[in-house]
From Swiss-Prot:
Name of the encoding gene: ORC6
Protein name: Origin of replication complex subunit 6
Homology family: Belongs to the ORC6 family.
Keyword field contains Nucleus: yes
Location of region: Disordered: 212-295
GO molecular function, one term: DNA binding
Biased composition (Polar residues): 254-263
GO BP term, example: pollen development
UniProt main location, coarse: nucleus
Length: 295
């Protein structure tokens, strides 16, 4: 398949420098090594070259569509992308300043730079000396994750999917790096969780409406500040146990009402037999019966 047709299907037909750079990378790949040894087909190789070129020119690349066109899984595509990138000796870089300008968050630049340096120091301090030299912090995923965490800390909206596409990684790897940064540098990237009142949450309000004992407890505490021991014991139970106890009490109430209705209800009247009717016969009728019997 031609490079220009693949680029048009990926929405890159208008970016001619990207297409020319991808064609150059494809020729370099054909000269340098045989990509079939790595298990990369021609179509997949062209798509990966387009993604590398798009990352160099800071052009948004639709990785989901690229994975679908390549006929590979996301993990296999990322593995092939890294192998081809290392074989070509090309490294994608992501500048914090360009991210700040692109997303309109210029004031985050010093915070991101400080967080990256602090994360690098603490991460290397936790590693053994033999592994420190092989650690690569120049990958774009670290810059993108630090930028996303700083934006989240300062309550600024940043498109996470767009960041993942720019750094050329998977969502799982981005989440892993973000979690590692938030754990090691909580003072820079962490977000303090505020404890919210249960009554202010919609789901909790519905739960309070379902539990009459909880409403009674709240009303008594607001009025007198005291509550009964039974209500307190019931509130100490877990939610599912309270629900089970309420169902059992409702069943017992229903059972007692059925039994009380059965006791108070009068016995049904027994069916009565119809008495035989014995009418007095007239003398004329008796004479007719005797005559008929004689005949």
């Amino acid at each position: 398949m031609d490079m220009s047709s693949i680029a048009s299907r990926l929405g890159l037909s208008g970016s001619r420098p990207v297409v020319r750079k991808a064609a150059e990378l494809r020729r370099l790949c054909d000269v340098t090594f045989d990509s079939s040894v790595l298990g990369i087909g021609e179509v997949c190789k062209a798509i990966i070259c387009l993604e590398i070129a798009a990352s160099k020119f800071q052009v948004i690349f639709d990785r989901a569509e690229a994975v679908r066109m390549s006929g590979m899984s996301e993990k296999a595509y990322i593995r092939s992308f890294n192998a081809l990138q290392n074989g070509l000796g090309v490294k994608t870089t992501l500048d914090v300043r360009e991210l700040g300008i692109q997303f309109g968050c210029v004031r985050l630049i010093p915070f991101v730079q400080k967080g990256l340096s602090l994360y690098k120091e603490r991460f290397l301090a936790a590693l053994p000396p033999s592994r420190r030299a092989s650690t690569d912090f120049g990958r774009p995923v670290f810059t993108a994750a630090a930028f996303y965490l700083c934006a989240k800390r300062h309550k600024l909206k940043v498109d996470k999917l767009k960041l993942i596409d720019l750094c050329g990684t998977s969502s799982s790897e981005f989440t892993t790096v973000s979690t590692s940064m938030a754990d090691l540098c909580f003072d820079v990237f962490g977000i303090a969780k505020e404890k919210k009142d249960a009554k202010s949450i919609k789901g909790s309000r519905e739960l309070l409406d379902v539990l009459p004992s909880k409403r009674k407890h709240d009303d008594d505490s607001d009025s007198s500040g005291e509550s009964s021991g039974d209500d307190q014991d019931e509130l100490d139970l877990p939610t599912y146990k309270r629900h089970k106890k309420m169902e059992k009490e409702a069943y017992n109430d229903w059972k007692s009402s059925v039994l009380s209705n059965k006791q108070t209800k009068p016995d049904p009247a027994k069916p009565r037999k119809q008495a035989q009717l014995n009418f007095k016969k007239k003398p004329s009728d008796m004479a007719l019966e005797v005559s008929s019997a004689a005949n």
